[in-house]
Regions:
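HAD-like small-molecule phosphatases
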Residues: 46, 55-119
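Asp-based phosphoryl-transfer active-site loop
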Residues: 1-13
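Catalytic-core regions built around general acid/base machinery
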Residues: 17-30
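Conserved phosphate-coupling serine/threonine residues in phosphotransfer and NTP-handling enzymes
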Residues: 37-39
Length: 119
Protein backbone atom coordinates (compact mmCIF):
# COMPACT_ATOMS: atom_id res chain seq x y z
CA UNK A 1 0.00 0.00 0.00
CA UNK A 2 1.43 3.37 -1.00
CA UNK A 3 -0.02 6.45 0.65
CA UNK A 4 0.65 10.16 0.82
CA UNK A 5 1.39 11.88 4.11
CA UNK A 6 -0.07 15.40 4.13
CA UNK A 7 -3.83 15.42 3.76
CA UNK A 8 -4.05 11.62 3.56
CA UNK A 9 -2.42 10.13 6.67
CA UNK A 10 -1.91 13.43 8.47
CA UNK A 11 -4.61 16.04 8.85
CA UNK A 12 -3.57 19.43 10.18
CA UNK A 13 -0.14 17.90 10.75
CA UNK A 14 -1.40 15.07 12.97
CA UNK A 15 -1.78 11.35 12.26
CA UNK A 16 -4.76 10.04 14.22
CA UNK A 17 -4.24 7.14 16.64
CA UNK A 18 -6.84 5.07 14.76
CA UNK A 19 -4.87 5.60 11.54
CA UNK A 20 -1.67 4.39 13.22
CA UNK A 21 -3.53 1.36 14.58
CA UNK A 22 -4.85 0.52 11.10
CA UNK A 23 -1.36 0.84 9.61
CA UNK A 24 0.05 -1.47 12.31
CA UNK A 25 -2.66 -4.08 11.59
CA UNK A 26 -1.96 -3.83 7.86
CA UNK A 27 1.79 -4.28 8.41
CA UNK A 28 1.27 -7.26 10.76
CA UNK A 29 -0.75 -8.96 8.00
CA UNK A 30 2.49 -9.27 6.00
CA UNK A 31 1.79 -6.53 3.51
CA UNK A 32 4.20 -3.77 2.54
CA UNK A 33 3.73 -0.09 3.35
CA UNK A 34 5.22 2.76 1.33
CA UNK A 35 4.95 6.40 2.37
CA UNK A 36 5.09 8.93 -0.46
CA UNK A 37 5.63 12.63 0.19
CA UNK A 38 7.01 15.83 -1.21
CA UNK A 39 8.56 16.57 2.16
CA UNK A 40 12.26 16.42 2.83
CA UNK A 41 13.29 13.47 5.00
CA UNK A 42 14.57 15.43 8.05
CA UNK A 43 11.30 17.37 8.15
CA UNK A 44 9.26 14.18 7.89
CA UNK A 45 11.28 12.49 10.64
CA UNK A 46 10.65 15.50 12.87
CA UNK A 47 6.88 15.43 12.51
CA UNK A 48 6.26 11.69 12.12
CA UNK A 49 8.40 9.48 14.38
CA UNK A 50 6.45 6.37 13.34
CA UNK A 51 8.33 6.04 10.03
CA UNK A 52 9.48 2.56 11.08
CA UNK A 53 5.98 1.31 10.20
CA UNK A 54 6.89 1.75 6.55
CA UNK A 55 9.05 -0.49 4.37
CA UNK A 56 10.03 2.42 2.15
CA UNK A 57 9.60 6.17 2.11
CA UNK A 58 9.61 8.04 -1.19
CA UNK A 59 10.48 11.62 -0.24
CA UNK A 60 11.34 14.90 -1.95
CA UNK A 61 8.71 14.38 -4.66
CA UNK A 62 10.29 11.09 -5.67
CA UNK A 63 13.94 12.19 -5.59
CA UNK A 64 14.86 10.17 -2.48
CA UNK A 65 14.09 6.64 -1.37
CA UNK A 66 14.54 5.88 2.32
CA UNK A 67 14.46 2.48 4.01
CA UNK A 68 13.56 3.01 7.69
CA UNK A 69 14.71 -0.46 8.84
CA UNK A 70 18.29 0.12 7.68
CA UNK A 71 18.19 3.93 7.56
CA UNK A 72 19.54 3.69 4.01
CA UNK A 73 18.98 6.83 1.95
CA UNK A 74 19.17 6.62 -1.82
CA UNK A 75 19.07 9.84 -3.75
CA UNK A 76 18.05 9.36 -7.36
CA UNK A 77 18.85 12.87 -8.54
CA UNK A 78 21.88 15.11 -8.07
CA UNK A 79 21.88 17.83 -5.41
CA UNK A 80 20.70 21.31 -6.39
CA UNK A 81 23.42 23.57 -7.75
CA UNK A 82 24.48 26.01 -5.01
CA UNK A 83 24.56 28.84 -7.59
CA UNK A 84 20.95 28.12 -8.49
CA UNK A 85 19.86 28.22 -4.85
CA UNK A 86 21.87 31.42 -4.27
CA UNK A 87 20.20 33.11 -7.27
CA UNK A 88 16.75 32.20 -5.99
CA UNK A 89 17.61 33.65 -2.57
CA UNK A 90 18.94 36.85 -4.16
CA UNK A 91 15.68 37.16 -6.09
CA UNK A 92 13.78 37.05 -2.79
CA UNK A 93 12.11 33.68 -3.30
CA UNK A 94 10.59 32.76 0.09
CA UNK A 95 9.80 30.29 1.40
CA UNK A 96 12.61 28.30 -0.16
CA UNK A 97 13.17 24.72 0.88
CA UNK A 98 16.37 23.01 -0.25
CA UNK A 99 16.51 19.25 0.05
CA UNK A 100 19.09 16.70 -0.94
CA UNK A 101 17.76 16.72 -4.51
CA UNK A 102 14.99 19.28 -4.78
CA UNK A 103 14.35 22.96 -4.35
CA UNK A 104 10.77 23.88 -3.49
CA UNK A 105 8.77 27.05 -3.06
CA UNK A 106 5.22 28.29 -3.62
CA UNK A 107 3.44 29.12 -6.87
CA UNK A 108 3.58 32.92 -6.60
CA UNK A 109 7.31 32.58 -7.39
CA UNK A 110 6.80 30.57 -10.57
CA UNK A 111 7.91 33.33 -12.97
CA UNK A 112 11.01 34.13 -10.91
CA UNK A 113 12.01 30.48 -10.63
CA UNK A 114 11.55 29.92 -14.36
CA UNK A 115 13.66 32.98 -15.12
CA UNK A 116 16.46 31.74 -12.85
CA UNK A 117 16.28 28.30 -14.49
CA UNK A 118 16.64 29.86 -17.94
CA UNK A 119 19.78 31.71 -16.85
Amino acid sequence: LATDYDGTLAHDGVVAKKTLTALERFKKSGRKLVLVTGRELPDLKGVFPELSLFDKVVAENGAMIYTPASEEERVIAPPPEPKFVARLKRQGVKPLSVGRSIVATWEPHQATVLEVIKK
